[in-house]
Amino acid sequence: MRENEGPKGEGREAMSEADPVDLIGQATRWWSTAIIDMRPGVIRFRGYPVEQLIGAVSFPQMIWLMLRGELPSADQAALLEAALVAAVDHGPQAPSIAIGRMAVTCGLPLNGAMASAINVLDDVHGGAGEQCMDLYAEIAGRLDRGAPLDQATAEGLDAYTAKHGKIVPGFGHRFHPVDPRSPRLLALVDAAQARGAVAGRFAAIGRAVEAELSRRKGRGIPMNIDGATAVIYAELGFAPPLGRGLFILSRSVGILAHAWEQTGQGGRIKGPMPRGIPYAYTGPAERAHSPDEEGPRAGPTTGETP
């Protein structure tokens, strides 16, 4: 029996008896979208003819339109652009960048190198912005229920770490005592708040988290790029999963640049370290093999038919 076909070819008979107009309607609804209207000679994004957008809107404005359905205000577009610019690259020590470069030396073209690099931007490397937005939302929910900011922050941190572990995303940095990107991004948020473009609620939450973490640790735990972009994306009303998507979109620029640079530099099969620097071997020392030596006997494989 073929897929989607009932006994005695019922699926085929039902399809043959269906109203052709209804079948066409089903086909056109198969991939329904409110994003683009594309027909011969016509391309409209969210209702706007593409020829009116070309040369009139910036790429960040276009990103906003595609994701949110409307064009942003000038302040909203400027904040989005600032966050995207800030996160484009962090050097070849970032695994995603290194993977993109290594992929080129293994013979992959740019699309393959970029795909290889983007695929590692997951929860541990690439997900901190989304996770930080979740933390901010946890605290914001407590504010909505009437808790003061310091209490909401402390309780929100406790709830988040109880669920996700002790690492708090968006704060502290293994390279930078103070991430140089964060103060500038927060200053832009403050300026936008002064103009009434954003509420400043999540900037206050982010700063409260920074203060509470520093109090608990007894030393400064400054906000990093993920915490700062999480402030911006939350202030702009993006859902947390889009925080990760926007980070990946931004970091893709750096991945492309490094992959292209490596293409020009050449090199074949470059690994994580130069050939002259050995890795650490932790296995047994050299030992001789005796022909009479027997290894451990293998037991029966679970589920194997005798």
Regions found by a protein language model. Name each.
Residues 2, 10-306:
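Non-transmembrane, aqueous-exposed alpha-helical and coiled segments at domain scale
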